[in-house]
């Protein structure tokens, strides 16, 4: 499995996303640039310029019509994915750490930072698509349709459950919350990870009925959207920055490594900078992929399950297309079931 190395950023990666077809990959880093790439061959399609601070997050609407980014310049920007023009800027009092479109693309959530006397919030905007042909995209609302304020512990990550029914948020204190996406009312809060170990990433399954969290407490957990019950726990030996669920095969991919500030001039192996594959059902580690020279900050899996991409503190995105042995790999019990 030879990776394609994408060199488009000068500073560490913060998030990468495939579009829904999986043919494009979007990456954001601390160097203010959003890059678009072809995922098949790693060719750079273009860049989107306009932000004045480190980019923390990116998401792409279901039809790849709009892109949303959140940054340290306290704005969320909406982009025309095709032309690269910025069609809307929403301003906030603090930095924006996570954006995500709802499954139908009609709404966009943004998670804002707790700072300078402002509490962390989750805001939701209604998104309009002009005439559907990519025109009039700049006709957007100015005010959010919903605002959730995190009184206790600030939200670090958030996303939409199946059918956009709930907003699921991961918090700085290691807990996970479920909010009603229409009223903003908190329905449940569960201490999923060790107290005060923040949740760094939260990614959903293909059908959005469950999700995986990655935490500083060196574990990742699969949790049900409906009742926030912890279904599986994957234990690693290093703090985790990111975790993703693979379609097609029952695996999860975890990424992390020693915190960037703790890294000394040791070998890449000692820093534990590998992508780890675990079996989703049996919770065993089944393999690792090396390559990054620094912690892994973000992992995204191709929506068809044919490959994955990882972005690291080293400023590189590595795109991997899975080989035949990956798809052939089975546990004995799975093989027996297939034979029946």
Curated annotation (Swiss-Prot):
<feature type="repeat" description="WD 2">
    <location>
        <begin position="50"/>
        <end position="89"/>
    </location>
</feature>
<dbReference type="InterPro" id="IPR001680">
    <property type="entry name" value="WD40_rpt"/>
</dbReference>
<dbReference type="GO" id="GO:0033290">
    <property type="term" value="C:eukaryotic 48S preinitiation complex"/>
</dbReference>
<dbReference type="Pfam" id="PF24805">
    <property type="entry name" value="EIF3I"/>
</dbReference>
<feature type="repeat" description="WD 6">
    <location>
        <begin position="291"/>
        <end position="330"/>
    </location>
</feature>
<dbReference type="InterPro" id="IPR015943">
    <property type="entry name" value="WD40/YVTN_repeat-like_dom_sf"/>
</dbReference>
<feature type="repeat" description="WD 3">
    <location>
        <begin position="91"/>
        <end position="135"/>
    </location>
</feature>
<dbReference type="GO" id="GO:0003723">
    <property type="term" value="F:RNA binding"/>
</dbReference>
<dbReference type="GO" id="GO:0003743">
    <property type="term" value="F:translation initiation factor activity"/>
</dbReference>
<comment type="subunit">
    <text>Component of the eukaryotic translation initiation factor 3 (eIF-3) complex.</text>
</comment>
<dbReference type="GO" id="GO:0001732">
    <property type="term" value="P:formation of cytoplasmic translation initiation complex"/>
</dbReference>
<dbReference type="GO" id="GO:0016282">
    <property type="term" value="C:eukaryotic 43S preinitiation complex"/>
</dbReference>
<dbReference type="GO" id="GO:0071541">
    <property type="term" value="C:eukaryotic translation initiation factor 3 complex, eIF3m"/>
</dbReference>
<protein>
    <recommendedName>
        <fullName>Eukaryotic translation initiation factor 3 subunit I</fullName>
    </recommendedName>
</protein>
<keyword id="KW-0648">Protein biosynthesis</keyword>
<feature type="repeat" description="WD 5">
    <location>
        <begin position="194"/>
        <end position="233"/>
    </location>
</feature>
<feature type="repeat" description="WD 1">
    <location>
        <begin position="8"/>
        <end position="47"/>
    </location>
</feature>
<feature type="repeat" description="WD 4">
    <location>
        <begin position="150"/>
        <end position="189"/>
    </location>
</feature>
<keyword id="KW-0396">Initiation factor</keyword>
<comment type="similarity">
    <text>Belongs to the eIF-3 subunit I family.</text>
</comment>
<keyword id="KW-0963">Cytoplasm</keyword>
<comment type="function">
    <text>Component of the eukaryotic translation initiation factor 3 (eIF-3) complex, which is involved in protein synthesis of a specialized repertoire of mRNAs and, together with other initiation factors, stimulates binding of mRNA and methionyl-tRNAi to the 40S ribosome. The eIF-3 complex specifically targets and initiates translation of a subset of mRNAs involved in cell proliferation.</text>
</comment>
<dbReference type="InterPro" id="IPR019775">
    <property type="entry name" value="WD40_repeat_CS"/>
</dbReference>
<keyword id="KW-0677">Repeat</keyword>
<dbReference type="InterPro" id="IPR036322">
    <property type="entry name" value="WD40_repeat_dom_sf"/>
</dbReference>
<keyword id="KW-0853">WD repeat</keyword>
<dbReference type="InterPro" id="IPR027525">
    <property type="entry name" value="eIF3i"/>
</dbReference>
